[in-house]
Amino acid sequence: GTSEASKLGILVAMIFFPYESLILKMIVASIFAMGGTFLFLGIIRKIKSKDNVLVPLIGIMISGIVSSLTMFFAYKGDMIQNLSAWLFGDFSGVIKGNYELLYLTIPLVIVAFLYSKKFTISGLGEEFATNLGLNYKQVVNIGLGLVCIISSLIIITIGAIPFLGLIIPNIVSMFNGDNLSKNIYLSGISGSAFLLLCDILGRVIIYPYEIQIGLVSGVIGSGIFLILILRRLKLEY
């Protein structure tokens, strides 16, 4: 629900701060993204089962609820047209004067690399990480902050790209384990290749017209996600 909460934050910024800069919209989107992420984590903590299939499904359900709220308020405020640029990812807006915000992700990615081993340990669970001397809550909060800010920057610049952050890291982990120090750059390269494929398909399917990359990645990503779920269920049963 992080990206959907970011879009809700963008809508709120457009309603209350219509003439302000993209920086302010990014800040509001980051705050909402963090709120959506904490909501997701709060629900997960109350559920006893931590099944690998159940957790992402809960995230998808939360995304659906937040997305519905966003569309409802956008419709009531007659802002569907204004919000459409952020509903689905589109590289057409990556032009001079718009994409410079993406440079802010560089130091954030460096911080993610520096904390990658700590993130790996925290993924083993709070009790195990604490026994190893890790400040679990601090590391988790840093990770959440990085995810929320980076997600907001990308959505403000390009728009939402469905399933990218869900399927690519999971596929990389399937083949390479859970070592984030290796998986971060592998996920980046794999995600870039996936986006390039979706962009090419979006440009050639109905040439000379173009399909938004968010629509293409949504169709392909949902299919891959179903395959991953069915594969997991087959291995378990």
Model-derived segments and spans:
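Alpha-helical transmembrane segments in inner-membrane proteins
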Residues: 1-237
